[in-house]
Amino acid sequence: MTDMRAGAAAPTVSDLINSGVDYAKSAKAAIPYAVAALGAMVLPAILGPKLGGVLGFVCGVATLFVAMMAAREAITGEFGYRDSDPIAVLKLIGVCILIGIVIMIVSIPLAMLIAGGVVGIAIFSLLLLAIVVALVSRIAFLLPALAMNDPISIQSMLAQTAPYWTTLILLFVATALPNVLLSALFGGVGGFFGVLIALIGAVISVALGLVSIGAVSRLYGQRARSA
């Protein structure tokens, strides 16, 4: 694996993916993360909007807690809860809400500028995905920074011009691509196979999500924190 410490050559997408897979294979966070994340995805669909929505929200918050602990495990090798985690999760929720607001503000005029139809929808989806990936990649280090209780702000992350930002964008594209292709190929399938494909997509999302957390957190711990 390529050395990702400060002063070493900027890692490639392959390096990051290998690093994330290496973490995910032995992560103590793997099972609790999978249970919480899958619960957040499937419970609303199985139990309905009321009970399922409440339990899905609880699982979503639990996912953020486990993601925080997973990021810390990827950096330190230790998996466990810290007293600083609740405040860190609240900050993370706030950032997620902020990202959602930004995406909503951007998507409305973008949708108005693009013609309708299948081609228009495809172009809109790709542009919106590009905006989301670019934004998330710029603040990717927020999760591991909060996990380690390091001082960091969105402004400081957006101001950074480190050589691996492009690599982070490509990492998120690579980990999102399987589900994008799955939706494109089987999005209109209904019935049992539709449910099966949705479950497969959820499992893929969880697995690649853990890989991404491991890759970004290790990059942050080995390079960004010592830069």
Give the predicted meaning of each segment.
Residues 16-27, 77-101, 155-159:
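Interfacial transmembrane-helix boundary/kink motif in multi-pass membrane proteins
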Residues 48-63, 120-133, 201, 205:
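Alpha-helical transmembrane segments
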Residues 2-4, 58-80, 138-149, 167-227:
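Juxtamembrane transition segments at transmembrane-helix termini in multipass membrane proteins
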Residues 30-34, 57, 93-94, 122-123, ...:
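Hydrophobic alpha-helical transmembrane segments
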Residues 46-57, 112-120, 189-195:
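Membrane-helix interface and helix-disruption motif detector
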Residues 83-127:
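Hydrophobic, well-structured mid-protein blocks that either form specific transmembrane helices
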Residues 2-3, 26-79, 95-107, 176-179:
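Short, small/hydrophobic-residue-rich motifs at membrane-helix boundaries and re-entrant hairpins
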Residues 1-45, 49, 129-194:
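Nonpolar helix-loop interface/hinge motif
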